[in-house]
């Protein structure tokens, strides 16, 4: 069986020659050069992904939602009862949550994965990869052991690769877990890897009262001070101040990239997972597509560090993969213009910036 290191070494580089060909093709379509803006750049980015064989296209679509509870909930950093994680996960199996509705609209399947829900019994309908009944309380201990983090990463990578073998060419990531916008899922990871102070990245999450924000900032600061995560080691950061859902999302990103396929990020938690995943393998960054700008406080800090600019700004902070599902039609639109628009040369049109030699080269 392959190790995590083996799989990380299989991540292919983006194909610059395919991207150059895509650029020439797009410049020769029935439009002024660059007039479709970021759609053109997105199509070129997709063309460079080896898993798409040089032609931007979308086959099957999947949103993988990683569900887990967090021991840091005990610190009073979330207002929702911990039981909501299990209840909402079960609702996902019925297709009634936000991500399920948006994914259905986009024609995507939702895979609900239990990586650490705190329930006595497995929940019917969920994919069971549960490591434990919730992560450790990072204000007083690590979230998990390094071995647990590496095993879950490997399991999720393998699951993602299996979906790719079965025809999925576009992935989205999402999460579900009470208290996960605190150190267990985002703020401590972002603070650790970007070097920014917790006060700059900690937000209200799922409507935390503002009078409790100071406690949340203190919890994040204590978690980092106690656990001393190494910002250069993505696995160490996830194991010490992360959560099982964060590890799972990082695994999807690594798995999709290892197949040369795109993965849509969701909101703030997925940015944190992406920061950790990029520390493990910087080669995955060209495969990451930011769906929307999260309304969480530290969102721009995380995205700036990743060098990513979201396609949507809908003031969303639901999580679940809702933004990833919402952005899937944008990916399909980029593929459609690439594959279905006519060419200037076929209509004997010459525009400034376009030449026949360019179009036919």
Curated annotation (Swiss-Prot):
Catalytic activity reported: 5,6-dimethylbenzimidazole + nicotinate beta-D-ribonucleotide = alpha-ribazole 5'-phosphate + nicotinate + H(+)
Gene Ontology biological process terms, A to Z: cobalamin biosynthetic process
Pathway stated in the Swiss-Prot or TrEMBL entry: Nucleoside biosynthesis; alpha-ribazole biosynthesis; alpha-ribazole from 5,6-dimethylbenzimidazole: step 1/2
Active-site residue numbers: 320 (proton acceptor)
Protein keywords: Cobalamin biosynthesis, Glycosyltransferase, Transferase
SUPFAM superfamilies associated with the record: Nicotinate mononucleotide:5,6-dimethylbenzimidazole phosphoribosyltransferase (CobT)
Record EC number: 2.4.2.21
One Pfam entry name: DBI_PRT
First-tier enzyme category under EC: transferase
GO terms of molecular function: nicotinate-nucleotide-dimethylbenzimidazole phosphoribosyltransferase activity
Subunit record text: Homodimer.
PANTHER family, A to Z: NICOTINATE-NUCLEOTIDE--DIMETHYLBENZIMIDAZOLE PHOSPHORIBOSYLTRANSFERASE
Protein family: Belongs to the CobT family.
Annotated function: Catalyzes the synthesis of alpha-ribazole-5'-phosphate from nicotinate mononucleotide (NAMN) and 5,6-dimethylbenzimidazole (DMB).
Name recorded for this polypeptide: Nicotinate-nucleotide--dimethylbenzimidazole phosphoribosyltransferase
Organism: Shigella boydii serotype 18 (strain CDC 3083-94 / BS512)
Gene expressing this chain: cobT
